[in-house]
Regions:
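Short cytoplasmic-facing helical segments at TM-TM junctions of multi-pass membrane proteins
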Residues: 11, 53-96, 126
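Glycine-rich helix-loop "coupling/hinge" segments at transmembrane-helix boundaries
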Residues: 33, 107-148, 164-173
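Transmembrane alpha-helices
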Residues: 44, 48, 80-114, 136, ...
Length: 174
């Protein structure tokens, strides 16, 4: 909707700006109040915290697709949904992948604090290491989180580069 309606895009940007400026602890309080502690609360807080980049970059990617592509699709009888699904989304893939990349990185960052409301996984290991002054345990789990984030980052960036080359947005030498 934001790629077609400037007023909606402006409202969306204000909401996303507010969401991205709030510290991640602010997401824990309402989730804890409404859903109590546990894994569901941790997942919900992680999703809410990490979703703004993919929304913003999806909107940006769809907005940056030249209007001539939509016009060609419409001239061949394409509906709005067909234009979105078969023309605009494929051309916006690099931006979508970067949004996915940023969302994953923020989700990993949130894993460090989700044990405060009942989250499990490597974040709990970091938290337990800090709580028990077990530096090795906390450091090992923290390094594992960082390595996972870096691996996913490199995979998505390499895939994005291939997509940009396939779309002719960059040359193979870059």
């Amino acid at each position: 909707i934001a790629s077609y309606n400037e007023r909606f895009r402006n409202i969306q940007n204000v909401v996303l700006d507010a969401m991205q400026t709030l510290p991640y602890f602010c997401y824990l309080i309402p989730v804890l109040m409404f859903f109590g502690g546990g894994i569901v609360s941790a997942v919900l807080a992680t999703v809410i915290y990490s979703i703004p980049p993919i929304i913003r970059l999806t909107s940006l990617g769809l907005t940056q697709v030249s209007g001539s592509y939509s016009e060609v699709s419409r001239s061949f009888g394409g509906t709005l949904l067909q234009t979105l699904g078969k023309v605009k989304f494929p051309l916006a893939v690099p931006s979508l992948v970067i949004g996915f990349n940023q969302t994953v990185i923020l989700a990993f960052a949130m894993q460090i604090v989700t044990p405060l409301i009942g989250g499990k996984g490597l974040g709990l290991e970091v938290f337990n290491g800090l709580a028990r002054s077990d530096t090795g345990r906390g450091l090992a789990a923290g390094i594992a989180i960082v390595l996972l984030a870096v691996i996913i980052d490199r995979i998505t960036l390499a895939w994005t580069k291939k997509q940009r080359i396939a779309l002719g947005l960059i040359s193979k030498n870059k």
